[in-house]
Structure formats: C-alpha cells, structure tokens
Amino acid sequence: MVEYISGVNGVGKTRTLAQAAIMTAQHSKGNVIFVDDTNKLKYELPSNIRLINTEDYMINSSICLCGFLLGLCASDFDLTDVFVDSTTDILALSKTNVDDFMEIIDRVSNATGVNFHFAVCDKHEDTLTYQCV
C-alpha cells in the first residue's frame, strides 16, 4: 500500500505523519522507519521507530530515494512500514513527477509487502488531503 498526505507548508503534514508512524509502530509486528531530510523529530519519535536523515546519505533525487527505499526493503525482512516526510523537498519534483514516483513505489510495495506513507507539499491544496495510490 502506498498513501500520501498533501497540503501547503504549515498545514500539519509532518505532525500527522509522525502521529501515524507512532500509532503504526504500536500495533506493528515488524519494523517501522521514518525518513526525513532533518533530525527535527529525533526526540518526538519513540526508539522503536528508526529515524533516517536523507542528508546523511546524499539522497537528492527520485532515483536515489527509490534505490534507498528498495535497499531498506531488501535489508530488513521484518520491515512493515516506511514513512517519508518532506518528499518534495528531498526530490525537488513537480506534482506530475511525484505521481510517477508514487507509481514506482506502488510496484515496490506490491513486490515487498511494505507499506509506504509520504508527506507531499502541494502549493495548491490549502487543507490536508489523503490519497492512496
């Protein structure tokens, strides 16, 4: 499953995604990972959620992020959920390219059984919007 929330900056995407990760980790029988472009959630996420900063791995394109996410799935057979915040900042993509990226990740999800959750900045959406791919 691939789902994402979108909205303008400051509408609460990060907080919503972090809360979803915490709730998921409480009920998950496997591992949960939170990917972000900063360490700002270091003290907000519990220790059973692994926080990964994309800056540490020089991830700056859709190809890099896709390969990184595939590597996470390949290296951890107990991985159930991956949460990715600041997706458009990491990828510097337009909305159209985000849709293409989500389709690729959907194929990864179907092949691995890992659920992916993204926060996407959309300058044209004033409220939080939830979508599944």
Regions of interest found by a model, annotated:
Residues 1-71, 127-129:
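Conserved P-loop
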